[in-house]
C-alpha cells in the first residue's frame, strides 16, 4: 500500500491569489494573531482520540520586524504569520512615514535605499482594505548583525582541573508570552568531556536572555550533571498551552533553579574518581520560562539500572541522551527524552499539563517484540508526521517509533550520526528519511520512506560515515540533493550523481532570495554551484561550537521573513551575534516556525550532534512551480 500524502490540513496559496484578494472585501480569514488581529483556542487537554480533530497549538508571535543595513540601504523584513489571512498585504513605515504607496502583496521584505542605518521601521497589515495596528518597532542590524550581550559566568576549578565558560548551544521560545522570542543558552565549561573520556567537569549552566541582553535567570545543573555534548539536551516549548514557553531538561541532586531553589539533596556528590556520575537519583524537571523556577520534577525515565546493560561498564553508553518535542496527539506538544542507542534504547514521552508532568508512554528495545530496535539510534533524532495520520512520530535513527509509543519500522542499518527528515522527493507522496551510518556492515548512506521504512536506495558500504546532509541546494536537480563524507559526489533524489560534492557537510540555511538552501559551516555561508561555490558571508569576530562539529549556537527562522538567521557566539563569549539576510526575495512564504515540523526541529536542534531543521514541505519545488508554500493549520493560546 503506498504511503499517505503528508500535507494534511494545509492550503497552498499563490502570490497571485494573495495579490488579487489583498485589497478587496470577502477575503478568506484564518484564525491568527498578526499585529492587531485576534485568535482564540480551546485550552490544552490531555484527552486522546483516534484522530486529531483540531489545529496544532502554535506560538502567538509578533511580526519580528528587522532592519538589516547593507550597501544598498536597509532591508526590512517581517513575518507572514501562519494565522494571517493568506491575502494579507502590508504597509511599511520609516520613523512614522509611509514608504509604500500601495500595500505590498508579495514577499514580506522591502528595501529602503539610502536610509540611515539607525532608522526605525514598523509594518502594518492590511486586511480587506483595512489597515491594522502597527507592529512593534524593528530590531536594527546596522552592520548586518545584532549583538545580544551575555553575562559570562566566572570559571573555577574542580579536582585540579581549571575551567572557564564558553557559550554553547541555544534555543528560542516566547518565555514571557509577549510574542517575542527570548534565547535560552547553555554554558559549557572548557573542561567538558565526551562520554568516552574520564575527568571531572565544571557545572553546566543554562541562562535565558531577552534580545536586548537582559538576563532573566540562570539554572545551575550542579555537580551531578556532567558537562559534554551527550549529557544535557534541553527543550524550550509551550507545553501547557498558556502562551509562555517552558524549559525542560535532565536534572539531579544539587541542581539549582532560576530562583535559587535546590532540587534534591543539595550536599550530595555522586561523582566517582573518574568524574562519571553512575549512582544517585536522576530527574526530569520542567522550569517556568519567565523565571527559571522549577515547576515539577519527576524521576528520569529510564533509570540507569545496571550500567553494563547499556554496552559498557565504565559510563560511556549508559549516559547517551537525546531529547525532542512532538505533537503525539496531533494537536498539543509533548516532550520526548531518551537514553541509549548503541545497544538498548529507551524513549519516554511526557506531557506537561496543569503544572504536572505525566508520563505518556515508554518504548524500550528490551521489551518483547522490540529487539530489532536495539542499536538503531543516532547521535541525534528528528520528529515528523511520518505516516500522514496527523500525529508525530519519533524518528530514532534507523528506526521510527509511532505516536502511541509502539515501533513503527526499523531498517536494521544500525547506529549513525546525521539524520534528516523532510519532503526530499516531492514527486512521490510523503516524507523521506536520509541517514548516514557508522556501522561498517551496513550502507554508508541510505534514503527510506518515512511512513514504512522501505529503503529507496543505498550508497557505499564498509565505512564509518560521520557526516551527511540532505537539502535542496541546487536548482539544477529536482528535489533535494544528498551528500556525505564517504560517498562520492552530490546525489540527486534517485541516488544518482548529479554534480561534485559540496565543500562542507554540516548545516544548511535559507539565506539569499531563492528557494535553494545555502551551506552553513563554521562561521561562513556559501552558495553551492557545480562550477564552484560562492562565499556569501564570513562571520566577523565570532566562533562556532562543538569542536570539529563547527556548529552555530542556533540557526533557524527566528526573526524577519522566512529566511533563516544564524546565531554564533562572539570569540570572547561576551555576546551572541545574530546575523540576518541582507538579500531581497520575491518569495512569499509564511514564517517557517508556524510549520510545526520545522518548529520542533528548532527545539531539538541542540540535541547531541546538532542538525539543521527541515520543514514538512519542499519549499524549493513549490516555489519553482509558482505555488506558494502550504499554509499552516494552527491555533494560538
Regions found by a protein language model. Give the residues of each.
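Secretory targeting and sorting signals
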Residues: 1-41
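Small/flexible residues
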Residues: 9-12, 65, 96
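Beta-propeller-forming repeat regions
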Residues: 44-64, 73, 80-85, 97, ...
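An N-terminal, helix-rich hydrophobic module
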Residues: 74-77, 91
Amino acid at each position: 500500500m503506498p504511503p499517505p500524502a503528508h500535507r494534511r490540513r494545509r492550503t497552498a496559496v499563490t502570490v497571485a491569489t494573495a495579490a488579487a484578494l489583498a485589497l478587496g472585501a470577502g477575503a478568506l480569514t484564518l484564525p491568527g494573531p498578526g499585529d492587531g488581529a485576534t485568535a482564540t483556542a480551546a485550552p490544552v487537554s490531555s484527552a486522546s482520540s483516534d484522530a486529531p480533530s483540531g489545529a496544532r497549538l502554535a506560538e502567538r508571535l509578533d511580526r519580528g520586524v528587522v532592519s538589516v543595513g547593507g550597501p544598498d540601504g536597509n532591508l526590512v523584513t517581517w513575518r507572514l504569520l501562519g494565522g494571517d489571512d493568506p491575502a494579507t498585504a502590508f504597509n511599511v513605515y520609516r520613523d512614522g512615514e509611509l514608504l509604500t504607496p500601495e500595500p505590498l502583496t508579495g514577499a514580506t521584505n522591502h528595501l529602503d535605499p539610502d536610509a540611515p542605518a539607525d532608522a526605525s521601521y514598523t509594518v502594518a497589515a492590511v486586511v480587506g482594505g483595512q489597515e491594522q495596528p502597527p507592529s512593534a518597532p524593528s530590531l536594527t542590524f546596522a552592520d548586518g548583525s545584532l549583538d545580544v550581550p551575555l553575562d559570562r559566568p566566572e570559571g573555577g576549578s574542580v579536582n585540579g582541573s581549571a575551567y572557564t565558560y564558553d557559550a554553547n548551544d541555544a534555543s528560542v521560545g516566547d518565555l514571557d508570552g509577549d510574542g517575542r522570542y527570548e534565547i535560552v543558552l547553555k554554558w559549557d565549561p572548557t573542561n567538558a568531556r565526551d562520554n568516552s573520556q574520564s575527568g571531572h567537569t565544571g557545572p553546566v549552566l543554562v541562562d535565558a536572555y531577552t534580545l536586548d541582553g537582559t538576563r532573566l535567570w540562570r539554572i545551575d545543573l550542579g555537580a551531578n550533571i556532567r558537562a559534554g555534548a551527550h549529557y544535557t539536551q534541553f527543550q524550550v516549548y509551550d507545553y501547557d498551552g498558556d502562551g509562555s514557553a517552558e524549559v525542560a531538561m535532565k536534572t539531579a541532586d544539587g541542581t539549582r533553579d532560576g530562583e535559587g531553589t535546590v532540587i534534591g539533596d543539595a550536599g550530595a556528590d555522586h561523582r566517582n574518581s573518574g568524574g562519571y556520575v553512575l549512582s544517585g537519583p536522576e530527574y526530569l524537571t520542567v522550569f517556568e520560562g519567565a523565571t527559571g523556577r522549577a515547576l515539577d520534577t519527576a524521576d528520569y525515565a529510564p533509570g540507569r539500572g545496571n550500567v553494563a546493560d547499556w554496552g559498557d561498564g565504565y559510563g560511556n553508553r549508559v549516559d547517551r541522551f537525546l531529547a525532542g518535542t512532538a505533537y503525539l496527539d496531533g494537536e498539543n506538544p509533548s516532550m520526548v527524552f531518551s537514553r541509549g542507542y548503541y545497544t538498548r534504547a529507551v524513549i519516554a514521552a511526557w506531557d506537561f499539563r496543569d503544572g504536572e508532568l505525566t508520563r505518556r508512554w515508554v518504548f524500550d528495545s528490551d521489551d518483547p517484540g522490540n529487539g530489532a530496535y536495539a542499536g538503531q539510534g543516532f547521535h541525534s533524532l528528528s520528529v515528523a508526521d511520518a505516516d500522514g495520520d496527523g500525529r508525530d512520530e519519533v524518528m530514532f535513527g534507523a528506526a521510527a517509533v509511532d505516536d502511541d509509543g509502539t515501533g513503527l519500522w526499523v531498517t536494521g542499518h544500525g547506529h549513525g550520526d546525521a539524520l534528516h527528515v523532510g519532503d526530499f522527493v516531492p514527486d512521490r507522496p510523503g516524507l523521506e528519511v536520509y541517514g548516514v551510518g557508522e556501522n561498517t556492515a551496513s550502507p554508508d548512506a541510505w534514503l527510506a520512506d518515512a511512513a514504512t521504512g522501505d529503503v529507496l536506495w543505498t550508497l557505499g558500504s564498509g565505512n564509518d560515515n560521520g557526516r551527511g546532509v540532505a537539502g535542496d541546494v541546487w536548482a539544477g536537480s529536482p528535489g533535494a540533493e544528498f551528500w556525505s563524507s564517504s560517498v562520492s559526489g552530490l546525489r540527486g533524489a534517485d541516488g544518482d550523481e548529479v554534480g561534485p560534492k559540496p565543500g562542507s557537510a554540516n548545516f544548511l540555511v535559507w539565506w539569499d532570495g531563492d528557494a535553494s538552501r545555502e551551506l552553513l559551516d563554521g562561521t561562513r555561508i556559501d552558495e553551492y554551484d557545480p562550477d564552484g561555490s560562492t562565499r556569501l558571508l564570513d562571520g566577523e569576530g565570532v566562533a562556532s561550537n562543538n569542536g570539529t562539529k563547527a556548529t552555530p549556537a542556533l540557526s533557524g527562522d527566528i526573526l524577519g521573513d522566512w529566511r533563516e538567521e544564524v546565531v554564533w557566539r562572539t570569540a570572547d563569549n561576551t555576546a551572541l551575534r545574530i546575523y540576518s539576510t541582507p538579500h531581497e526575495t520575491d518569495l512569499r512564504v509564511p514564517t517557517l516556525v508556524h510549520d510545526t515540523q520545522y518548529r520542533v526541529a528548532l527545539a531539538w536542534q541542540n540535541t547531541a550532534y546538532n542538525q539543521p531543521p527541515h520543514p514538512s514541505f519542499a519549499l524549493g519545488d513549490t516555489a519553482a512551480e509558482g505555488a506558494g508554500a502550504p499554509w499552516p493549520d494552527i491555533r494560538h493560546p
